[in-house]
UniProtKB/Swiss-Prot annotation:
One of its GO terms (biological process) is biotin biosynthetic process. It is found in: Cytoplasm. This is Pimeloyl-[acyl-carrier protein] methyl ester esterase. InterPro entries: AB_hydrolase_1 (IPR000073), AB_hydrolase_fold (IPR029058), BioH (IPR010076), Carboxylesterase_BioH (IPR050228).
Length: 256
């Protein structure tokens, strides 16, 4: 069995598992891991096929969630950013007894635009899939640039993301393609109506991948959840607003 790369830091009485987004790895959390590990027992994870979790091919969302769960603490707050938000949500749906609280960051239950649902146009995601086979390093860099556009610190935030990608070997093309397929096809809007643990959704006002229009729609669909929009953030609020981001998680800890 292939192993997921997993690092544990801190001795807090609440476990917090962080799941990164598409094309990246757990190094993306280095800007906040010291602060968070002073409040939580923090778990940094490379999703299957990404970063140091080698030897995995393309996986379905359900298989990815099960692979991550095998090495997880019995109970934790699960936080997922972007694609990682879908993985954390899937775990909350299938193993609610393992999830003290669910936090999604710049994530959508349905990334792909549908009828009367704002999101990434399916042909844009299909275009990324096509370009992966031509020049996958450049494609990943383009995707990262999209994530920070519009913020006051866009250039340095994009550099931080690129540094994260380059710190470790690139994922295999089929893994990247499989991740895009999840973003293109998965729709958890209805299933997540049945999640009743504390559920915090964090967004960036300037996010070009998860439009802020989805926030009031999901407030209505999931009245038991809470949402918060970082006014000057894009797709990576923990990089552009680390102190504010950590404060929200510490406040959540008091409630679980």
């Amino acid at each position: 069995m292939n192993n997921i790369w997993w690092q544990t830091k801190g001795q807090g009485n609440v476990h917090l598992v962080l799941l990164h987004g598409w094309g990246l790895n757990a190094e993306v959390w280095r800007c906040i891991d010291e602060e968070l590990s002073s409040h939580f027992t923090l778990h940094l994870v490379d999703l299957p096929g990404f970063g140091r979790s080698r030897g995995f091919g393309a996986m379905s969302l359900a298989d990815m969630a099960e692979a991550v769960l095998r090495q997880a603490p019995d109970k934790a707050i699960w936080l997922g950013w972007s694609l990682g938000g879908l993985v954390a949500s899937q775990i909350a749906l299938t193993h609610p007894e393992r999830v003290q609280a669910l936090v999604t960051v710049a994530s959508s239950p349905c990334f792909s635009a549908r009828d009367e649902w704002p999101g990434i146009k399916p042909d844009v995601l299909a275009g990324f899939q096509q370009q992966l086979s031509d020049d996958f390093q450049r494609t990943v860099e383009r995707f990262l640039a999209l994530q920070t556009m519009g913020t006051e610190t866009a250039r340095q935030d994009a550099r931080a993301l690129k540094k994260t990608v380059l710190a470790l070997p690139m994922p295999e093309v089929d893994v990247l393609n499989g991740g895009l397929e999840i973003l293109k096809t998965v729709d958890l809007r209805q299933p997540l109506q049945n999640v009743f643990m504390p559920f915090l959704r964090l967004y960036g006002y300037l996010d070009g991948l998860v439009p802020r229009k989805v926030v009031p729609m999901l407030d209505k669909l999931w009245p038991h959840s809470e949402s918060y929009i970082f006014a000057k953030a894009a797709h990576a609020p923990f990089i552009s607003h680390p102190a504010e981001f950590c404060r929200m998680l510490v406040a959540l800890k008091q409630r679980v």
